[in-house]
Amino acid sequence: MTQDYELVVKGVRNFENKVTVTVALQDKERFDGEIFDLDVAMDRVEGAALEFYEAAARRSVRQVFLEVAEKLSEKVESYLQHQYSFKIENPANKHERPHHKYL
């Protein structure tokens, strides 16, 4: 199975106590360029290399996508269950209606 989506680090900005990493979601099959990007802000870690922040940002964004996908899946499943559910009546519990025959 090939991976159609890729998380790409687009940039890193350093602030006094924070580091912000911009991570973009790209669809390699259907779109040229980015679908969207997210800025992930993290506290600065003493002695941490740039790769540390990039990996942490990717993990954070991946986790967000997994949580969103799970919620969407639950909503779709709930919708489909509601949409296609029907009540089956037991004929033994049904009151027979009298039928009148006209001659």
Curated annotation (Swiss-Prot):
What single Pfam family name could you report for this chain, choosing any that match? DUF1327
Cited InterPro entries: Phage_ES18_Gp24
List the protein's name: Uncharacterized protein YdfR
Give the organism the record lists.
Answer: Escherichia coli (strain K12)
Gene (UniProt): ydfR
